[in-house]
Amino acid sequence: MGRFIFVSFSLLVVFLSLSGTGAHCPSGWYTYEGHCYRVFQQNMTWEDAEKFCTQQYEKSHLVSFRSSEEVDFLVSLLKVDLFWMGRRDIWNERRLQWSDGTKVDYKDWRAKPECIVCRATDNHWLSTSCSETHNVICKFET
């Protein structure tokens, strides 16, 4: 009985000590500030990359950033130059109005949707066509 209590207590101590070290992220994922990240060196379009991320883990999406420290953390993991971010600018979803204040009901845009990549070498964000292919970083909140 005493041995069982000792083993149970030991396992509890190990579990509690691992709870802040990324043990809550799936295997192959990195942890930072309550989020899990995984770098995939696979070139995909933005739409395919976002779909791919949602298939990797139920709450996962393309990476988004909340701070420069978060970007620095990810760049330290990378062996890729350009990767998709979870932000895109779709012309047809903009809330536009005419100079007289009326709503824009008619749209005849020639521009294609623009998506955002991050260049890891200098942390700059670049607007590019969503049909280009780039590497993928998925992220979800723990």
Swiss-Prot record:
Annotated transmembrane regions: none
Membership in a protein family: Belongs to the snaclec family.
Record's protein name: Snaclec 2
Gene3D superfamilies: Mannose-Binding Protein A, subunit A (3.10.100.10)
Keywords from the named record: Disulfide bond, Glycoprotein, Hemostasis impairing toxin, Secreted, Signal, Toxin
Glycan-bearing residues: 43
Tissue specificity as recorded in UniProt: Expressed by the venom gland.
GO molecular function: toxin activity
SUPFAM superfamilies: C-type lectin-like
Gene Ontology CC entries for this record: extracellular region
Stretch forming the signal peptide: 1-23
Function in brief: Interferes with one step of hemostasis (modulation of platelet aggregation, or coagulation cascade, for example).
Note: Shows greater sequence similarity to the beta than alpha subunits compared to other heterodimer snaclecs.
UniProt xrefs under PANTHER family: MANNOSE, PHOSPHOLIPASE, LECTIN RECEPTOR RELATED (PTHR22803)
Subcellular location: Secreted
Segments forming domain C-type lectin: 32-139
Major localization listed first in the record, in broad terms: secreted
Quaternary structure and partners: Heterodimer; disulfide-linked.
Disulfide bonds: 25-36, 53-138, 115-130
